[in-house]
Amino acid sequence: MTDTSAIFIIVPTADVTSITSELNYVPASLNSEGFIHACEYHQVAEVVSRFFDNHLALSVLVVDVGLINSPLRYEAPSTTMSSPALFPHIYGALNTDAIVDVCDLVHFKHQPITPEIMAVLRHYRFERLPVESTLFKSTWRSSSNNTHGEPVGTAMIGLYCDSLTSVSCFHKLTFDEVWHFYGGDPLELTLLYQNGDSEQVVLGTDFTNGQVCQYLIPAGVWQGGCLVEGGQYALFGCTMAPGFTGSCFTAGIADALIEAYPNEEKVIQKLSVNGHQTTMPEGFAT
């Protein structure tokens, strides 16, 4: 056993909504074998290659060990694996409130999730933002609308962490956005301006080294963000007035951005988690 803060369950992405909408997860293996198969971070890749169709879209359920109601045992697998390490087995239904994140397998880093990050996930109960997959939680959405039908203001809390690939892809908004730094390690925003210039802004608490705790990003500026290298996580917030709606968001495509901003190719490639998606799903944040 190499990590005790989190275990992971691999499921088809198409099943995630039905799994998380129930109080308990009861897969077929619980009836046929008496337990739910899970794995540690370093076992995920082999489990996927051995037991799942490589054409199937898969997601990884991040399960907080401390929240599991059923007995958890570490046992030898029923089939021979490349490593002699024991596998976590859950002997009973999994209460779904122990699932603190759902990560697309293609973005899973196969790294341990520290107890500090698990504590933040447990407390805030983030969701994944469509297109970007950023861990976020909406904290305020005004009940008053402007003349265009948009909320007069919105606020959210977000979490950047590399071990769960929570970043912001390059995107632009039709309204100004104010960023706030709340805690953890510093984060870096890269801004790409229409005139071809770019800028890096570090949000954090070390103002003597140029970090800022608040920053305004003007409407129409390409913005992307991530944890500063070497950190565990960054907790931040964003507020907008008018408020955020799905229709005010446009994500960038890496090739086009690199052509326009060749000096920022490295960070553009790093943050292009959206692939070819450029718009939020219809009806999101309306």
Residue ranges and their predicted role:
Residues V65, T239-F244:
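Short edge-strand/loop segments of extracellular domains
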Residues S59-V60, P88-G92, Q214-L216, C226, ...:
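Active-site scaffold segments
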Residues S70-P77, D101-C103, T190-L192, L227-V228, ...:
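Short, conserved acidic/polar surface loops in the N-terminal third of protein domains
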Residues I113-Y215, G224-G225, G230-Q232, P242-T245, ...:
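Non-catalytic, conserved peripheral segments adjacent to functional cores
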Residues T2-P112:
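Conserved, structured core segments of small domains
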Residues V11, C39, V62, Y91, ...:
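Residues in well-ordered beta-strands of folded domains
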Residues M1-T2, T286:
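Eukaryotic N-terminal targeting leaders
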